[in-house]
Amino acid sequence: MDTSDLFASCRKGDVGRVRYLLEQRDVEVNVRDKWDSTPLYYACLCGHEELVRYLLANGARCEANTFDGERCLYGALSDPIRRALRDYKQVTASCRRRDYYDDFLQRLLEQGIHSDVVFVVHGKPFRAHRCILGARSTYFANMLDTKWKGKSVVVLRHPLINPVAFGALLQYLYTGRLDIGVEHVSDCERLAKQCQLWDLLDDLEAKCEKVSEFVASKPGTCVKVLTIEPPPADPRLRADMALLADCALPPELRGDLGELPFPCPDGFSSCPDICFRVADSSFLCHKAFFCGRSDYFRALLDDHFRESEEPVASGDPPVVTLHDISPDIFTHVLYYVYSDHTELPPELAYDVLSVADMYLLPGLKRLCGRSLAQLLEEDSVVGVWRIAKLFRLARLEDQCTEYMAKVIEKLVEREDFVEAVREEAAAVAARQETDSIPLVDDIRFHVASTVQTYSAIEEAQQQLRALENLLVSIGLDC
C-alpha cells in the first residue's frame, strides 16, 4: 500500500507525502513497479523539479549512461530537470544510505575486511571471502573444497578470463547487483556460464534485449553501462547468506533444518574464524559479518581489549563468551547479521529489541518494531508507543499514533493515555520550545489525513472534539 502511495505521490508531485513515506514509513526510494519504473522516473516524466531534487538527495539512482539514467533524462518534462539529473553527482557516499545491508556487502567487497582468499587475475588482485563465495555459488563451493582447498592465493591466468568481468562477477555474488560496460558483457556472460550462474546469465540476456529495444526506439540515447539489479523483495541473496547462519548454529538448535547444502563440519566448510559461546551453546561465525554489521562486535573482536579465550585445539577459531543473552535470542541476532532478516514472533520482539540496542544493530531494531506493530490494540498501544519512544523507532511511533487516531474516542477514557499526554506536555514545557504537544499533534495529523470524503468530515470532527475535551479537562490548551 505504501509503495503504491509513493508512485502516486511522485506522479502528483506531492513532496510532503513523499518525504513522509520515505522518512517515516521507510519505503525504499528505488523500488520498481510492474512497468520497471522508479519513483524518480515518474517525478521526471511529470515535471516535478523540486521532487526530483529531493529524491536525488535521498538516494534515488540516476547513473549516467545507464538504462535508468538515460530513461529519466529522455522522459524528463523540462530542461531544468534534465540539468538537475546531469549536474547531480553520483549518489553514493554523499547521500543518506537507506539500505544498510547492501552498503555493508558493498564495503565488504571493496575493502576485503577479514578476507581469507585472494584471486589474482592476470596480475590484478581481488580479495574475497570463502564463506560468501561458497554460499552464493555451487561452482565456487566445489572449487574451494577441491582444487583451491587450503590456498590463500588463487592465480587465474586463462586468457578468456577478463579481470573487469571477474570483478563484476564478484560484485554480483556479494551484492546481487552487477555494473558492467557494454564492451565487457560477452566476457561476463562467459564467466557466468563457467560458474554455472544461470540466473545471472538469464538476467544479462534479458537486460541486453531491453537496452537494445530502448536505444532503437529513443534516438540520441547512449547506454554504455549495463546494470543488473535484483527485483523488489528478491529473496535469493538473503536466502543464500542465511545458509551461513544455518551452518553457524550449534547442532542442538538446528531443529528441522534438515540436510544443509554444505554440511558442517563435514564436506564443504563455511570456514568460520570466530566462535561465540552463549550459555552452553557454541556458534561458529565469521568476523567479516559481525564486525561489518555491528560497531559493538567490531570493538569486541578487533580492538585490543577484546575478551577472547584461547582456542580449545590448534586450528580451531578463538572463542568469545557473550553474557546476558540466551541462545534463542542470539539465534535471531545471528540470522539478522547474515541475512538482514529473522522470523521474529511478537512475544520475543521486546527481548530481541533490547539486545539489538545493546549490540548497536539499528536494522534489527526496526525489524523488532515491525513485529511489535502486530500487537497494536486499545489495551497495548500506549505501552508500545512508549517502547517506540524509548528506542527511537520513528516508524513504530508513527504507526502507534496512527492507530491512536482511529480509536481516540475510547483512548481518552484510559488513564494510561491521559498520563502519556501529561508526560509529553511536561517534557515540552521543560524545553520551552513550543506550545504544542508532539503526541497530540501527531494524532491530529492522522485524524485529518483520513478525511477523503464529505461523510468522513463529521467523524473526524467528532474524534477531534473528544481529544480537545480531554485536553481541556486536564488543563492543557494547545
From Swiss-Prot:
> What is this protein's function?
May act as a mediator of the PTEN growth-suppressive signaling pathway. May play a role in developmental processes.
Keyword Repeat in annotation? yes
InterPro entries tied to this protein: ABTB1, Ankyrin_rpt, Ankyrin_rpt-contain_sf, BTB/POZ_dom, SKP1/BTB/POZ_sf
Classification lineage: Eukaryota, Metazoa, Chordata, Craniata, Vertebrata
Q: Which GO terms describe its molecular function?
A: translation elongation factor activity
State the ANK repeat positions. 1-31, 35-64
| Annotated Gene Ontology cellular component terms | cytoplasm; ubiquitin ligase complex
> To which species is this protein native?
Rattus norvegicus (Rat)
Instruction: Return the protein name.
Output: Ankyrin repeat and BTB/POZ domain-containing protein 1
Xref: PROSITE patterns: ANK_REP_REGION, ANK_REPEAT, BTB
**Location of this chain's protein in the cell:** Cytoplasm
Name residues in a coiled coil: 450-478
